[in-house]
């Protein structure tokens, strides 16, 4: 059996106004090589950008990988590690029987994570973690760039 490539992914989301213009930032490290990605959206939320960042990163991987994915979003980490199991059993409803917010992105993140072995890590934001700080700059810059791209799944 072939050993999976070990990829370190760092993600962050940003939103000015929440809702407002938003963006995501990604830093990916593999064997000393670094790739950065970011994009902005005209009207979205911080939580949607926190979810979209790992989705884009995982979807960019061309083969199954061992991933260490680090984010400062407890919402994303708790959701994918804990809450999603109950949501799926309940037909994407919360324990209060209300529809899961951002269900389009949760379904996409669930699908994107299936082919990989992922260690979901949390890091405190704005605490000097180099890759997280870089992701924050990428996400904020994308949000501040006056993006015109719509976030098609955003529902006010």
Swiss-Prot record:
- Please share the entry's free-text remark on the cofactor: Binds 1 Mg(2+) ion per subunit. May bind a second metal ion at a regulatory site, or after substrate binding.
Q: Mention one GO biological process in which this protein takes part, according to its record.
A: DNA replication, removal of RNA primer
Provide the Gene Ontology terms for cellular component. Answer: cytoplasm
Q: Does the UniProt entry include the keyword Flavoprotein? A: no
Alphabetically ordered keywords of this record: Cytoplasm, Endonuclease, Hydrolase, Magnesium, Metal-binding, Nuclease
Task: List the catalytic activities from the record.
Answer: Endonucleolytic cleavage to 5'-phosphomonoester
Say where the protein is mainly found.
cytoplasm
Enzyme Commission number(s) from the entry: 3.1.26.4
Residues annotated to bind Mg(2+) 1: 12, 50, 72
Q: Which residues form the RNase H type-1 domain?
A: 3-144
What PANTHER family has UniProt attached to this entry? RIBONUCLEASE H1
Identification of the protein by name: Ribonuclease H
């Amino acid at each position: 059996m072939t050993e999976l490539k070990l990829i370190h992914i760092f993600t962050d989301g940003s939103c000015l106004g929440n809702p407002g213009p938003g963006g995501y930032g990604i830093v990916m490290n593999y064997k000393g090589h670094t790739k950065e990605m970011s994009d902005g959206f005209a009207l979205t939320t911080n939580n949607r950008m926190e979810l979209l960042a790992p989705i884009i990163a995982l979807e960019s991987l061309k083969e199954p990988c061992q991933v260490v994915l680090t984010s400062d979003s407890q919402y994303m980490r708790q959701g994918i590690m804990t809450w999603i199991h109950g949501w799926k059993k309940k037909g994407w409803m919360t324990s209060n029987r209300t529809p899961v917010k951002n269900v389009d992105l949760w379904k996409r993140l669930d699908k994107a994570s299936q082919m990989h072995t992922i260690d979901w890590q949390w890091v405190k934001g704005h605490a000097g973690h180099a890759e997280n700080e870089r992701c924050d700059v990428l996400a904020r810059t994308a949000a501040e760039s006056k993006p015109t791209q719509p976030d098609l799944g955003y529902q006010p």
